[in-house]
A protein has these predicted regions:
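A structural signal for short hydrophobic beta-strand segments in well-ordered beta-sheet cores
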Residues: 74-77, 120-121, 189
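Amphipathic alpha-helical effector-binding/dimerization core
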Residues: 81-167
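N-terminal helix-turn-helix
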Residues: 2-97, 225
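Generic non-transmembrane alpha-helical segments
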Residues: 37, 54, 102, 106-113, ...
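Extended hydrophobic
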Residues: 167-228
């Protein structure tokens, strides 16, 4: 009796697509890890070898992963060195409007509740920059705190709140650090990866921290929830 030929086992379409999807996901993850390694490197332009060590891959793998990142302008190569590309600026330009839009409802409610100018402030290097500001509608006067206002992270409630540790109280108050006679209370926006920001209020009248502090902290939490 003749032996039957052994049929090769051919993966099903579902198995093949699942494997391909898993491989694509791993490649994407490694590509993002590589981009992060370039951004986090101690030097301005890390080498291929340094990046390979940073992400636990071979030099050949790093070269392959760099190709799509270069094509999209996210990185640029200078010989064996790699720098961040200008394409990241185009992506970054889309972030601020989205942050502002997500924060506006919470800021509006905070400003109306406290009767003070409410703001969302983000860290930009060693400075704090206001990217969204809402003024109360019913007060006679209020602090003119404008979008784009910058100051040191070490001055004012907005900047100092960004650096608050998780184990510290949820808000911080300052007086006269940015404008003479102006008082501010701010709380950090926590739980949003990659975002260093705070929500706060600033006014010329005295603020009761026991009353306003929890409101500011709740607004910061609402902003974080809107961004997740």
């Amino acid at each position: 009796m003749a032996a039957r030929p052994i049929r090769p086992i051919v993966p099903s379409t579902r198995q093949t697509s699942t494997a391909a999807g898993r491989e694509s996901s791993l490649t994407l993850d490694r590509g993002l890890a590589l981009l992060q390694a370039v951004a986090d490197a101690d030097s301005e332009a890390p080498t291929i070898s340094e990046l390979a060590t940073a992400i636990g891959a071979s030099r050949a793998a790093v070269y392959r992963l760099l190709v799509p990142l270069q094509e999209r302008g996210l990185v640029r190569r200078d010989g064996s060195k790699v720098r961040l590309g200008l394409g990241l600026l185009r992506l970054a330009a889309k972030v601020t409007p989205q942050l502002r839009l997500a924060a506006l409802p919470a800021l509006r409610e905070l400003a109306e509740s406290v009767g003070a100018t409410a703001h969302l402030t983000v860290a930009d290097g060693d400075e704090a920059q206001a990217i969204a500001v809402i003024e109360p509608s019913w007060t006679t006067y209020h602090v003119a705190y404008r979008v784009g206002t910058r100051h040191s992270l070490g001055r004012g409630a907005a900047g100092k709140a960004i650096g608050l540790r998780d184990e510290t109280p949820g808000w911080i108050a300052t007086t006269g650090e940015l404008q003479p006679g102006a008082s501010g209370i701010a709380a950090p926006v926590r739980g949003v990866p990659g975002l260093r920001a705070s929500v706060g209020v600033i006014t010329f009248h005295e603020l009761d921290g026991d009353v306003v502090g929890p409101k500011v902290r709740a607004a910061a939490t609402a902003v974080a929830d809107a961004l997740r």
